[in-house]
Amino acid sequence: MGEAGIEVVENLLPSLRVELDLDLVIAQAENTTAGKGISLSDFERLRAAGVDFCTGGNHSLFLKEIHEAMADPLQPIIRPANYLSKTVGLGYKYIDTPDGPVLVISLLGQIVGRDADKPVDNPLQIIDKILKSEKSNKKVAVVVNFHGDFSSEKFVIGHYLDGKVSAVIGDHWHTPTADADILPGGTAHITDVGMCGSLDSSLGVKYSDIIPRWHDGRQTKNQLEKEGRMQFNALLVEIDPKTAKAIKVKQIRKIIAPSS
């Protein structure tokens, strides 16, 4: 979430990649640049920090400078696949790993989709079409990032895709949920993975801006918090390359105290 989130990733991810021997790092990047969209330079910063692939959400297309990269099959960044078909960019792409290719898909929930920067289709119907056209090899790992508001919707798509994909990782709340699990069909699932950025804030925004809005309805501008404690949230998923099913899942949460 904003500059604070980028700096947390830059500070922690390089050592985590080594410590955990990670094959693939996927980041939800729609709030990277000032909390809305992602610029080319910030995309490059995340890549330099160790992020292999970036998924999207309702602000993915806010900055036009990233559109060309999203439309390039060789650039590891996507927008939600259930944007209407004529929308710029791609909603799923493959990326190579030491254990073979991984298909990464980004989806937007129907509730948050009402406020998206572009119109959206039904995510369940779209994922059906994608899997039918792309998953001829059932051993290919498939990771789905689901950007949605309602926990009920996130539960539904997780269980709908159980056994069809390797992982369904929810986000959008900026707050991690304590429900990381491997579903009966072998699909890793979490309702919300959380965010990287300010901890002492309202989802990354300064309390001084948010409290007056809730207290007496004053209209205030969202300013991102850059001071205080920071947080790093992620989900570690181990996938069996022979079956493309999840065999281990673990939440990662680190709190960074402000430097004195």
Model-inferred region functions:
Residues 1-260:
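Acidic, metal/ion-coordinating pockets
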